[in-house]
Amino acid sequence: MRILIIKLSPIEAITSSMFRTLAIARGLSEAGHKIDYLVVPMNKLNSASSEKEFIKELNVIRTSKSEVYEKNVINAENSFKALRKQILRKIWHSLSVYDYTYLIAKKIKIDILPVREYDIVISSSDPKSSHIVVENLRKQGLRYKRWIQYWGDPLSIDITQKSIYPQWVLRLIEKKLIKNSDKIVYASPFTLSKQKELFKDYKDKMVCIPTAYMEEEIYPATDNQKFIIGYYGNYTARVRNIKPFYNACRALGDKVSVAIYGDSDVKLQATPNIAIYDRGIVDEHKRIADLLICILNSSGTQIPGKLYHLAGTNKKVLVVVDGEQQQEMREFLLSFDRFYVCGNSQEEIENAIVSIMKDNKEFLPLPELKYDYIANRFIE
């Protein structure tokens, strides 16, 4: 089949949503399907990952840049322009439910595509403007047999949403976005349940398919003098609470060596046993780590894609559950027989780490989350 995947992010970017979409693309490509992959170019705000070899098998199509956004928000070099950039970004994100790629989505022309007819079109968010591209191209003559929407955070229950609009307005916008699709895929069973409740007219085309990991990562056994722990991901205060984990690691002292990588508005102080880094490449640290940490969101229904990527390793993984559905999430995660799980309190985390340090259990990547298996489920 010929398949068009639309993901208005740079294909080189280090984001969970890009990784989960690329996992689908890889699985479909290796199954023999021809993939056109529509993305936006890199800009100065993006962090680049190392390019995956299989990307060369995709026909990557890059849109033009948003000149208005590039000029006024991205390319600010002196202090005045930098301040203006910060103000303009805040204004934009408060007045719009989309990011800057909305401008690209509305102006995109069908001539950018090599063909005008596909067996399947997949639009993947975030950003949510990826779905707008399909509607725009439909009006210009795009034809397809099925349109599958792949959602990360739904619009109206997105805990990272900074828009000034009330929930009922966001739901109207979201309803308009999903109504013409043939299939809607969510990565969390809790998100699926909530969306079926909110959009009853479209519940029959909604499904939950877990996020796929893109590569199996098998590491040799470690022989560290100290127990090495890695946390890799952003930890913005309004999304997840990293303080209990941080405090637990401080309390454990020289029993553990901890590295925290990620962007945040929370200022954590480095200690003799805890190193703090900005977001970046973590491959080398992951190789030597004894335990990987995933902290779930403080509220909402989403499960971070990072959790599933960690399931593609043979490392021990501790998932710290939080929010109003802790018990349900705990039961769901334990059903995989792959993760250690605890609540988000210093005491629980500290006790869990001490217990894991004594546990000799070994793990392998979960086959039911591998990219080829998930990609096949995706287009069923």
What kind of feature is each model-predicted range?
Residues 1-65, 183, 249-252:
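N-terminal subdomain of nucleotide-sugar transferases
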Residues 23-24, 103-106, 129, 155, ...:
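Membrane-proximal helix-turn-helix segments that form the acceptor-binding/catalytic region
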Residues 43-106:
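A conserved catalytic-core segment of Leloir-type glycosyltransferases
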Residues 108-130, 144-148:
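Short N-terminal targeting/anchoring amphipathic segment
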Residues 179-204:
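A short, active-site helix/loop in glycosyltransferases that binds the activated sugar's phosphate group
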Residues 190, 211-212:
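Carbohydrate-associated surface elements
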Residues 214-217, 224-267, 276-280:
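Conserved catalytic-core segment of nucleotide-activated headgroup transferases in glycan assembly
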